[in-house]
Amino acid sequence: MQAHVSIILPVHNAEPWLDECLRSVLQQDFEGTMELSVFNDASKDKSGAIIEKWRVKLEDSGVHVIIGGHDSPSPRGVGYAKNQAVAQSSGSYLCFLDSDDVMMPQRVRLQHEAAVQHPSSIIGCRVRRDPPNSTERYTRWINQLTPEQLLTQVFTSNGPTVIMPTWFCSRAWFSHVGPFNEGGQGVPEDLLFFYEHLRKGGGVIRVDQSLLLYRHHPQAATHCVLETTIWTHRVRFLEEQALPRWAAFTIWNAGKQGRRLYRSLTAGSQRKVVAFCDVDENKIRKGFYCHEDSQERPKPRIPILHFRAARPPFVICVKLDLTGGAFEDNLRSLHLQEGQDFLHFS
């Protein structure tokens, strides 16, 4: 019988966390039919035995369990494991779960309600971080974005505005967007899927309750992706989705990050940069930034202005929540509309 919701669980050497993760599947208060689709990606620890132990408990409580996997010498990667778990499942809705995280009992029920209302959206939720003081700024960002910012802040270094371990969507929409990139270690498969979702007009919704205990530890797959890889994808997505709307723009930050963005742009996008802006008097006194690596003659010289003298739209390369509120106050004082007059790329 086809389940209503499939919980998609890729597993690789998850022994320390798997009991707690699978117990949270058993404790869901969703009243529809639910199945668990596990794909064991070449685990070499006791993950397989733990899955078998919980299969009995889950099936006794009415949750059908499908187990796939392989025991090759090395794993095929998170994207592959997720795709396999989706392919072997049957539910009309997909609830993604990482093997080191723990769902709150109401997660499936509340996200399913939202997904029924928003069939072409990715549904996320708020999270509780474990340990509580790890990645405080990032956790605040995940939990406090406004509904509008879920779509306007998709260019930042934080990645998807609802994090992958909280994703819930219809199978039909997943099939329309997916599958995940299977490049393996070092590929930001969640970010690439999220960008493709946005390209296809998908929405982003967050259930404003903390429905997941989101673990931070050194073995997490997130730590395997290079910052330079993510940077390249982000710049290309900015150029594809945002910059075509603007004939000219200002880069807010004449320091390292702003100059790095400028140098990363294509020549066509570089020509749209009319100025850098900043609050640092030393940078402003310099008067301009000269792009020494440019093939153009004369080399481009971009003015550096005080932010009050600069004209929107802005691409902002200043990190949020780091200056004790000074940057945020400056931005607010200009009375601009996010998404229209400025975008964050920090």
From Swiss-Prot:
Family per similarity comment: Belongs to the glycosyltransferase 2 family.
Name the UniProt record assigns to this protein: Queuosine-tRNA galactosyltransferase
Substrates-to-products reaction catalysed: queuosine(34) in tRNA(Tyr) + UDP-alpha-D-galactose = O-5''-beta-D-galactosylqueuosine(34) in tRNA(Tyr) + UDP + H(+)
Annotated localization: Cytoplasm
One GO BP: tRNA modification
Main location: cytoplasm
Example of a GO MF term: tRNA-queuosine(34) galactosyltransferase activity
Function: Glycosyltransferase that specifically catalyzes galactosylation of cytoplasmic tRNA(Tyr) modified with queuosine at position 34 (queuosine(34)). Galactosylates the cyclopentene hydroxyl group of queuosine(34) in tRNA(Tyr) to form galactosyl-queuosine(34). Mannosylation of queuosine(34) in tRNA(Tyr) is required to slow-down elongation at cognate codons UAC and suppress stop codon readthrough, thereby regulating protein translation.
Keywords in alphabetical order: Cytoplasm, Glycosyltransferase, Transferase
GO CC field: cytoplasm
Entry comment describing in which tissues the protein is expressed: Widely expressed. Highly expressed in adult pancreas. Expressed at moderate level in kidney, spleen, thymus, prostate, testis and ovary. Weakly expressed in small intestine, colon, peripheral blood leukocyte and liver.
Organism ancestry: Eukaryota, Metazoa, Chordata, Craniata, Vertebrata
Pfam families, per database record: Glycos_transf_2
EC number, as in UniProt: 2.4.1.-
Disulfide cysteine pairs (residue numbers): none
Superkingdom of the organism of origin: Eukaryota
InterPro entries per record: Glyco_trans_2-like, Nucleotide-diphossugar_trans
